[in-house]
């Protein structure tokens, strides 16, 4: 028995003694039979960014074989706005590598994410998961390397305020109980996410913490480990489903909305990326940021105005992207700098053995920390279409390897100061700005769409649909229009409270 596999929280991994990437149809059937699973759920992302579910009762083995092999029909026009009702039938086919036991189901149930196929049995070009697959595949074909990612999933928990052990307003970062009220809820979420296959790094309370009209609003975060980019999207998708369902069970309201109210921390969805080759992280060379990393960053300096179309998808997103809110407003990057768009966080590049210094009885470990270095995109938020967002970032990083002056772009956009401080206002003025509305984001995507459509990664129909939806908000002057109008701002927040 493999001890590492036996420790895995996903019941299938522990039982089958193999990683999810090796799951077969026979494995799924064996698990269902031996664990007395009575139902199967197909789950798949729709155009609103949320998971949809199709339930099956297992009548007999022949029926189980049929649904696992053939999938089922669904109405694509009810799932995606860019699919017309006249030719809307799609197939959904389960991906065995995503299988998990539903932690909420009273009847033993096995759930799997699905891929979409058209009438000819070919992958649907505009499907979220297939778009990301194409972006990842093309990145590898162009660079010879693998694109990996992980997300920092921020959310607010909202419940009646007891008045006891009040936390300090906007000072909730890494707070412990009893000042942080929802630690138990967060750790239960983490346990369930791990059971569904999520590779979690850690969880903690976040900056946002305030009371309003008798309710406490507490911001929390669950951060994941870097994995292949398609797997990263699947994990985040399921994690949001878990957190919402558990919130419902506890009687808490939960939101991933980018903005709650004026002057309070909004919720982001920061994405960390690393580039791998032969199992080795390529982000560092000789302890400093590598040329490979700087080329990828250059791509993210060229395309961020249009990338906002994927992770900043409703008007409240642009109320978060303002100065002094730990959210970026300008196109730049830097080391350990939270005022920039792309941050290079600490990467354990120091030559000292900190464990030995903290624990004198320990011998030097010579632990390989080179795998840890990432770069972080800080503009995304909880309204994101996860698959489009990660596909867009893969395209941007790939583009950095295709432009001749990538290293010059990286050098010109690097900053090592807080760009929002008055003494640095000249530097701030020299930097390109992110869009300030959905309409502006749509305009930027229209201008740069050819790069996303290259290699047929994003289909023209998908880009058209995104632009049409963003322009439909008609929010070009909304940020200025709502200045000093807290009640109207609150109405807007409520409208998009359950986005993404």
Language model region names:
Residues 1, 161-162, 212-217, 362, ...:
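Short hydrophobic/aromatic-rich motifs at helix boundaries and adjacent loops
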Residues 17-18, 26-33, 38-48, 52-120, ...:
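Active-site capping/gating regions of soluble enzymes
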Residues 7-11, 167-169, 270-281, 366-373, ...:
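Short acidic (Asp/Glu) and glycine-rich catalytic loops that position anionic groups and cofactors
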Residues 324-326, 415-423, 467-476:
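Eukaryote-specific, cytoplasm-facing alpha-helical/coiled-coil scaffolding segments in long proteins
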Residues 1-210, 227-241, 252, 388-389, ...:
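ATP/Mg2+-dependent ligation/transfer catalytic cores
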Residues 113, 152-166, 209-223, 257-279:
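Histidine-centered divalent-metal-coordination microenvironment in nucleic-acid enzymes
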Residues 408-438:
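Intrinsically disordered, low-complexity charged/polar segments
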